[in-house]
Amino acid sequence: MRSMKIILCAIFFLTGLSSFASADVNWRQFEGTTLNGIYFTANYIDAWFRPMAKKFEKETGIKVRFQVLVGPQMRKKQDIMLAGKDPQLDLVMLQMDNRGGKLTAAGHLEDLEPYLKDSSLTPSNYDYPGDWLGGCLNTEKVIMGQPMNNIVWSAQAQLLHIRADLFKKYNVKVPTTMEELEDAARKLTIDENGDGKPEVYGYLSRGWGRLTTASFASYLFNFGGSWFKTRPDGSKVSNINSKESVDAFEFYGRMIRDYAPKSALSNKPPQNAALYAAGKAAMLSALNYWHGLADDPKKSRISGKSTTILVPAGRAGSFPNIPTTSLAISKYSNNKKAAWLYIAWMTQKHIMLAGQKAAVPMCRKSSWTDASYNPPTPAWGKSAQIAADYGIAIAKPQAIAIGQIRDLAGEVMNIAIRDGRRSAIQAEADKAAKKINEIVAKTEKGMDFSGALPKFAKKLNQSDQLAPIKAEGLHNLGN
């Protein structure tokens, strides 16, 4: 019922948006233009992009046609059109931590700074970067010296989904540290009939190869590890075989091996989310987007029983992982000014607030603080906002040859989960690091591809780590 109310409120809000348009920009200056974009499949396409495209066309006279494809197909189609300098491609949707380095290095994305400064194209109240959350801004540039070639608009977050009802029933402390996380997973692995097949598993996360890099990132950095490090001479080398990184691999592997169902070894995020919604796990490490499935009374057995908190801190601190999504303009577009007008319109305060109300986590501060916005749960709102403000988007190793390097990191994780011996993990990490260094030496000469590293992030303090738990009234459990 609550989800339906949120959707209805969002629909009513969307119908009245045109009256909010900024008067200092002539929104109809490119009337009759058609823009083409290639976007990837996501919940926000139907929840926000399609209704907004209709509003945009009504207000500006510009038609937006976007082809929506699953990730691999989208990337292939974008690559073909960009490599061919196809002028028919205007708008590019991308995650900078996944595609930004490659497309920036190739020179495929337009520098947006001149458009941002043009008062005829950008509303005077646009408030960039002032109204953008810090973590989102950290993700826009992945190569040092990179031009401002994208506008980040949405920030999903890798959070810990928890069954609040089970934590209350068994009086288990809601975790703020990695040690407490494992303790909670142990206590909430529930085998009621003693047959060795738990009715509820304590923990669930991605457990298959390269896909684990996205969910593993927060654990890696919280333990003090990293994908890469910089030598004194400035060269970039792999760091996945450092003590801290191997500690993280070992911990994450043990959590999957000891407290998750065997299907986690091959599941993709949708399958894990479905298991959690079916009541088969007490905790799920996944994007905050999946809360919608867990809270849907038509699809979930745990509707009203789940919320989200930040991934617990490690010995190095807490670095929330926020896979952000950006909009960019093809360098070869024939409609660059009209394309920027679309981006500027879509990322105005009132338009992004509409997305926020349609359950799409936005990168504007005002979207979170507006008095009319009500999050799905208090803890979901707090954890998602804190992650977007403090987080870093380095779910995947920042490199041109990102696919190859994710595969190598995935092999280390496979050993961590299936074998678990420290010596075996270290040996695989050493082997992977050597191969990664060879790849980087061939593909990234002359580049400072540092990405949004923890050293650039704001330090998350203990009170922030605890804030979502307090917001849900769960902070006194386990005492």
Language-model-detected regions and their locations in the chain:
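Extracytoplasmic "Venus flytrap"/periplasmic binding protein-like
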Residues: P51, K55-W132, D165-T176, A274-L275, ...
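Short, well-ordered beta-strand elements
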Residues: E31-N43, I62-Q67, D90-L91
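Extracytoplasmic/periplasmic solute-binding protein
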Residues: L137-W153, Q158, E182-V237, A281
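Short, solvent-exposed loop/beta-turn-alpha elements that line the ligand-binding surface or hinge
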Residues: R28, E113-D131, N193-G194, G202-Y203, ...
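Glycine-centered hinge/linker elements that transmit conformational signals in sensory
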Residues: A184-K187, R231-L265, T307, V311
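Hinge/lid segment of periplasmic solute-binding proteins
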Residues: D24-Q29, R99-A157, S215, Y219, ...
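Mature extracytoplasmic/periplasmic domains
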Residues: K55, A273, Y289-P297, T325-Q404, ...
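Long, aromatic- and glycine/proline-rich binding clefts that accommodate carbohydrate-like moieties
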Residues: Y128-D131, L137-K141, G304-L310, K357-I417, ...
